[in-house]
Amino acid sequence: MLDGELFRQGRLEMSSAPLPEFQTPAEWNNLLPNKIAIVLSVVLVLVYLKDIIRLIPPLLYALDRKRGGESLEYNVSAARMRNTVALIYTLPFCLIADYCGAYRPGFWSMVPPEWSSAATLGVMLAYFLLRRLCYAAIRPGKMSAESLATLKHSLYNYFIALVSVAVPTIGILPLFSVREDIISTVFLALTGLAFAFATVRAWQILKSRRSPLPTILYLCGLEILPAAAVVASAVLL
């Protein structure tokens, strides 16, 4: 029966109906929510551009010197400026992370592509909230308020440096037809390097007031635990 339908008078009969066209996923930068978020990021950076430029000298000093973070915290206006810039940079960081596919757990398939960046921002805010809770629950003793603020905000310094480097780097690589997997690897490497530097600086701050074992325990509870929770959710969920 089947052969009779396929072959008639010694010829292969094929349907003349056109094959259905498969829709390809929309380009990341063509999704409307991403366009809006990109424009918002640019507007925020332009609005605070003067503050960002003023922050460069104390930020570089804080990154270069072991006690540079303390001097930045003593400068109240610079510290507030740093915190504001770190908050502003959260949006472009999440946009780059989503563009590179840096966070893709199993349940991410349920997230519509147009809301993937917003979901990534939610994960980032959850990380900051968990880190804040860790600092509220685990307070190292024998530390002044200024020293604790230096420890808590040290990550912000490296986060700002990371975004300042990652934005132009990830923006330029596609112009040279670099593969997406390589771009993602570069972003993950930059992020890991920035977190490693921030962890080392936190170690130095804690070690100056603690013996090695308590330093390791505090470091794990305050910095490594929140980051490990994000990595574990990406791998296990």
Which residues make up each language-model segment?
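Hydrophobic alpha-helical segments and helix pairs
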Residues: 68-121
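Cytoplasmic membrane-interface regions of multi-pass membrane proteins
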Residues: 54-70, 136-147, 203-204
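Alpha-helical transmembrane segments
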Residues: 29-46, 113-127, 180-189
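Membrane-interface segments at loop-to-transmembrane junctions
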Residues: 71-78, 146-155, 213-219
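Hydrophobic alpha-helical transmembrane segments of multi-pass integral membrane proteins
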Residues: 41, 82-100, 126, 130, ...
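Alpha-helical transmembrane segments with an aromatic anchor "belt"
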Residues: 102-175
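Terminal transmembrane helical module of multi-pass membrane proteins
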Residues: 165-237
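N-terminal juxtamembrane cytosolic/stromal segments of multi-pass membrane proteins
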Residues: 1-83, 94
